[in-house]
Amino acid sequence: MMDKETAKHRAEELRRTIDQYSYEYYTLDEPSVPDSEYDRLMQELIAIEEEHPELRTPDSPTQRVGGAVLESFQKVQHGTPMLSLGNAFNDDDLRDFDRRVRQAVGDGVAYNVELKIDGLAVSLRYEDGYFVRGATRGDGTTGEDITENLKTIRNIPLKMKRNLSIEVRGEAYMPKQSFEALNEERLKHEEEPFANPRNAAAGSLRQLDPKIAAKRNLDIFVYSIAELDEMGVETQSQGLDFLDELGFKTNQERKKCATIDEVIEMIEELQAKRADLPYEIDGIVIKVDSLDQQEELGYTAKSPRWAIAYKFPAEEVVTKLLDIELNVGRTGVITPTAVLEPVKVAGTTVSRASLHNEDLIKEKDIRILDKVVVKKAGDIIPEVVNVLIEQRTGEEKEFNMPTGCPECESELVRIEGEVALRCINPECPAQIREGLIHFVSRNAMNIDGLGERVITQLFREHLVRNVADLYKLTKEQVIRLERMGEKSTDNLISSIQKSKENSLERLLFGLGIRFIGSKAAKTLAMHFESLENLKQVTEEELLAVDEIGEKMADAVITYFRKEEMLELLNELEELGVNTLYKGPKKVKAEDSDSYFAGKTIVLTGKLEELSRNEAKAQIEALGGKLTGSVSKKTDLLIAGEAAGSKLTKAQELNIEVWNEAQLLGELKK
């Protein structure tokens, strides 16, 4: 068991590493490491945060859904978030999941077991039975519009068998045979082959020319409808049958299991079939079958509590460690990275792995030119498991961390209680550059077209030294950069100007205040409403805000007491950057005179005038509390079409029931 201080610094390192790997995987489609390493690091971080809940931060990768939208396609907002799943790695993890489920909903639980297809998660929107829009998962809330490419997949019906307006979720993939044929063709034309079928599928669906996607023989399995409970369907297994009836292709390697023991048996059966399947799978998905029980279990910020993904055991290979490189992050932390002799692990070429810190290198006695064991459990991140000391030849070289920053040569320091070495020079080019990249990122100021490549050029040409300089850029300066034409320059200048209108929480997150992630930034912006108020805030006022702890409060106070930070913020204001919160304000029940104020409300069935999320937001803005299941504590059920079992239960408990017209009437008051 780690002491709190060690755990704190390990958690910080894990968050940084996981965020970087998430960016490589979800944004660039160029994962540098396999799933196994990513999963291992995530499990380690989850364990630390469970052991020390006070170390859990709002911006931790365990709290969010990771991934940003590329610039090549239009952005699409998902009606219902496309969340990721928690992971199980062994039978004990599955039994723990089962225990949590039964503690929440009782013993009458059945599970639906399905294959986890290794492809690209997509959302298909149908209006009156017609396919109108397809999108990638993206960051779970916002994806990319790839409608024209998805239309080339023959198993996606352009017209359903019923005139429904629904959002269908599925996994687009490339069959093994198509993948092999594609790579043979690429090699014939002296093009680089794809590392695995998933990368090939993702790359195909992100082609701007749909004709390219059409040639690549992609396929799809669908697995859910976002509005399933509005279709009069009561279980996940019925939902899959319903999708079959509508003309979609679902995976038939599935089974409804009455107990977790049956689930484990089914997993063993499916795992034995893995090599013979005509497509790649990277695990098995286990879902609570009852939709009512799913609603009762609900969600964390990152994943549903009613489903889990069983991940296959790790694969290990031996390769040579060629060098150790050092990277400087935006907070000055120096992270060593292993440069490996490229090696294939489960279909992916691995050439780099994070070594986290100097202590880990010493603990494992890792030397340059060592033969090392690299582990991969899935497809994202690699880990150097251990060194093959018995294979040393004498040419290996010990690695020693430098005393100076690899970027600016300033003296490196180890802050008391921290594992990492830091560069504390505020003028360090690497820190400034990384800070600029963070400022323009998806969850911060979200400036389209201003990615790492352009930021690096702007910095190298001395056109920007801080975030305020971004708002001083001219068309003449930008168009001279590499690969920047007239149109891309105009679009970039327009995006920069548009970002001035962002709500305060985006600016706060973009400033990179330590411990303040996107969620904490939203909380602060909502509570204090303006940057001016935050400049004058006291520690007592900060600690009075829900979800703001001592570390966060101290970081905010420290930031707003620095003269150079205040000068930067004043400059941003003078340049026209908005410093006010523009979002909806939380309403306390006692401050609302609405009928909904203080009431516990359940929504069920399909609403015609509003989406479920719109209705929920408006009810909560009037002081109502939304829950997923009907109980004696429920004050009101609002029933749309095909309300199903929730309506029956509400009537049995004599709970007040409204229709959509009554809801709209109250909202208009």
From Swiss-Prot:
EC number, UniProt record: 6.5.1.2
Active site residues of this protein: 116
A biological process from GO: DNA repair
Cofactor(s) listed: Mg(2+); Mn(2+)
Catalytic activity: NAD(+) + (deoxyribonucleotide)n-3'-hydroxyl + 5'-phospho-(deoxyribonucleotide)m = (deoxyribonucleotide)n+m + AMP + beta-nicotinamide D-nucleotide
Residues that hold Zn(2+) according to the record: 405, 408, 423, 428
SUPFAM superfamilies: BRCT domain (SSF52113), DNA ligase/mRNA capping enzyme, catalytic domain (SSF56091), Nucleic acid-binding proteins (SSF50249), RuvA domain 2-like (SSF47781)
Gene Ontology CC annotation, any one: cytosol
MF annotations from Gene Ontology: ATP binding; DNA binding; DNA ligase (NAD+) activity; metal ion binding
This protein's record includes keyword DNA damage: yes
Binding residues for NAD(+): 35-39, 84-85, 114, 137, 171, 287, 311
UniProt entry keywords in alphabetical sequence: DNA damage, DNA repair, DNA replication, Ligase, Magnesium, Manganese, Metal-binding, NAD, Zinc
CDD domains: BRCT_DNA_ligase_like, LIGANc
InterPro entries for this protein: BRCT_dom, BRCT_dom_sf, DisA/LigA_HHH, DNA_ligase, DNA_ligase_AS, DNA_ligase_CS, DNAligase_adenylation, DNAligase_N
Domain BRCT: 591-669
Family classification: Belongs to the NAD-dependent DNA ligase family. LigA subfamily.
NCBIfam families with a match to the protein in the record: dnlj (TIGR00575), PRK07956.1 (NF005932)
Function noted in UniProt: DNA ligase that catalyzes the formation of phosphodiester linkages between 5'-phosphoryl and 3'-hydroxyl groups in double-stranded DNA using NAD as a coenzyme and as the energy source for the reaction. It is essential for DNA replication and repair of damaged DNA.
Protein name in the entry: DNA ligase
Provenance organism: Bacillus velezensis (strain DSM 23117 / BGSC 10A6 / LMG 26770 / FZB42)
Gene name linked to the record: ligA
